[in-house]
Amino acid sequence: MIDDPLLLDACMHDAIELAQRGRFEVEPNPRVGCLLLRDGEVVARGYHEFYGGRHAEAMARAEAAQKGVRADTAVVTLEPCSSPQGQDGKKTPPCTEALLRAGIRRVVIGAVDPDPRHRRLGIQALTQAGVEVLEGVAARACEALYERFRRTVQLDRPWLLAKWAMTLDGKTAAPTGEARWISGPEARRRTHELRARCDGVMVGFKTAQIDDPELTVRLVSGKQPVRIVVDPLGEIDDDSNLVRTARQAPTWLLCSEEVDARRSGVLQDLGVQVIHVPTAEGPRRLHLQQAFRELRRRGLRRVLVEGGGGLVAQMFAWRCVDQVLAFVAPKIIGGRLSPTPVGGEGRPFMAEAWRLEEVQHETCGEDLQIAGFVT
């Protein structure tokens, strides 16, 4: 095993670069990178690739096993997790076990887990198993990597990703309300991939009424997310696709506490799970913070919001949007009656605009995909 602090620091910075490959895919989980070393030489690499996927340590261990190499040191940007699979919605086995099974004798850690529920438990599990733990290597760079994750831990709600498709002039539908299809097949396939990697997919009542969506994963293989409709008055049509298929795919309705028991009972008899939450600013607006906390309490950690503009505007007003993914199609619709992705009153001045950071642009078929985190 190596003791050169400069080499360990260089390895940790390499692990940080690896961790960044999970950007936009792993949230609300932290981005993590891992290097496995033998006698000072890197023999395997891993990173947390996407939400619900294997963690960095497991990926690195698999690569080492494939090569038939046994490492002695792990360099990892964040304290390895130790909680069992299934606890608090955890989708993967503990990384401490992966490292112990790999025969690792030393673990070099950049940052301690900022989540108070898990902080230092991974370190404790490793040291109790006789593994040497070295903390604080490239600590400042690793702490910076987890600034957003630290805020996420404190939110007590799911990670909320707002996604929309719009024309070049910023419209999400024609003046008639017709919106199929703005984006091309590649963007639609990517949307289905994203649905499969989320715990829930949410729309507002108007989108459910006008578009009559299914909100299921169809173009790719993957698990079906919980389908959620924000419907304060419980007005969703009993013959809508979402209600008709509620027994085939989980469907939740967020409505106000004022929706009577008879209406709630009708929906529940049709297979819809009705969740009552308090209102804010009148009966047609739910207290979104309370609604999202309830979703988190029920085990949802990552929710994709697919509109419409009214719901997304309310979420921005409540400061509840964490990430944005927009597909911009090379089409122009025009018309002052054509809806936009974010409705409401808007921001009064450009200086007050909601801004994105870590912005990423890439082509997706004929469309442009823009992703970023809301500041």
Describe each PLM feature range:
Residues 1-27, 44-45, 64, 68, ...:
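Enzymes that bind and transform nitrogen-containing heteroaromatic metabolites
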Residues 20, 79, 104, 109-112, ...:
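A broad detector of the eukaryotic-type serine/threonine protein kinase catalytic domain
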Residues 24-26, 53, 123, 137-165:
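Proteins enriched for Cys/Gly/acidic motifs involved in redox and nucleic-acid/cofactor modification
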Residues 33:
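Helix-turn-helix
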Residues 36-141, 226, 252, 257-259, ...:
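Zn2+-dependent cytidine deaminase-like catalytic core
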Residues 40, 50, 54, 149-152, ...:
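Generic signature of intrinsically disordered, low-complexity segments enriched in small/polar residues
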Residues 47, 75, 146-149, 327:
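Aromatic side chains
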